Amino acid sequence: MRQGRKEVVSRVNKPVFFRLQESGIRQFFYLKGEMKAMEKIRPKYYITTAIAYTSGKPHIGNTYEIVLADSIARFKRQQGYDVFFQTGTDEHGQKIELKAEEAGITPKEFVDNVSTEIKRIWDLMNTSYDKFIRTTDADHEAQVQKIFKKLYDQGDIYKGYYEGLYCTPCESFFTESQLVDGKCPDCGRPVTPAKEEAYFFKMSKYAPRLIDYINTHPEFIQPVSRKNEMMNNFLLPGLQDLCVSRTSFTWGIPVSFDPKHVTYVWLDALTNYITGIGYDCDGNSSEQFNKLWPADLHLIGKDIIRFHTIYWPIFLMALDLPLPKQVFGHPWLLQG
């Protein structure tokens, strides 16, 4: 047996061989053409991390999340699942525009540098992702513009005027009642008044449907404490319509029919989970999308649970797409 193993290693380069070991003997025999019948019936498993925001170098929390997701992806492969693991970088928004200005370079140069560093670290840690998406990818940007137009055409997005409070680090809007001690309830930083023309999404139209879905799908938001937080703090008190465009900065995906507006960063970022696997809102989605969606698991930090369990499922409902099977909000891992 020992000699046979050496012969295998000599025929297959070592990195590939050890990956085959991890995935199990079945993949090795698949390469020899002896398990193609089983391949046809392997259940799919689509797992994603939140895409890392490129306002600076990755922090320990980003690394914690990618390692968790990688462990799950590897385990599912060993169980025989046909796994697709997607991660990537979120590259638009006011915060990035300001950071690039401070650095004396263009926003695109800034995000190129940060995204390259993030990918280098993920590769250094040998994470087994299948797709690394960037929200500056041309195909993603084009699809976001089409999604925005579709939602506008069907009456889910309307033009109005925004006046309220904005947290630049979180790229989030808040009402006075949502603040904690007058500061952002998510990060604790000061908020600033914002007043500008904007497009809004009719969150209120879909809120009752989402509440019913959460109540009838207890596995959708995990752990349960996160579900209770979303229901009690946001959904049950009454969901306000969401501002989905900005005019006070330019680093974003332009609204195709009104280019002085750029798409709100969360409508842009959240759609990566479908654009990355070939979604097309014109009805020409790829075979990969039809195979993989809905996602089996969105693994995210607890600080962005609201975006993934309220805004994202409502966007999907408006697009007439099924919701991900589970969103898991993990705790933070902090330095110091």
Predicted regions span which residues?
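Short hydrophobic targeting helices and cationic amphipathic motifs
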Residues: 18, 29-31
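Structured secondary-structure scaffolds
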Residues: 39-87, 139-143, 193-336
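Short, charge-patterned binding micro-sites
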Residues: 89-95
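A charged helix-plus-loop insertion that forms the helical arch/lid used to bind
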Residues: 99-112
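A broadly conserved sequence feature marking short terminus-proximal activation segments
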Residues: 110-166
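Cys/His-rich short segments
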Residues: 154-207
